[in-house]
């Protein structure tokens, strides 16, 4: 599962 970058994690699983 791929998600857009977030302020906490570059790649959120």
Curated annotation (Swiss-Prot):
Keywords assigned by UniProt?
Stress response
Q: What induces it?
A: By water stress.
The entry's other comment says: On the 2D-gel the determined pI of this unknown protein is: 5.4, its MW is: 43 kDa.
What name does this protein carry? Unknown protein from 2D-PAGE of needles
Q: What is the lineage of its organism?
A: Eukaryota, Viridiplantae, Streptophyta, Embryophyta, Tracheophyta
């Amino acid at each position: 599962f791929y998600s857009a970058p977030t302020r906490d994690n570059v790649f959120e699983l």
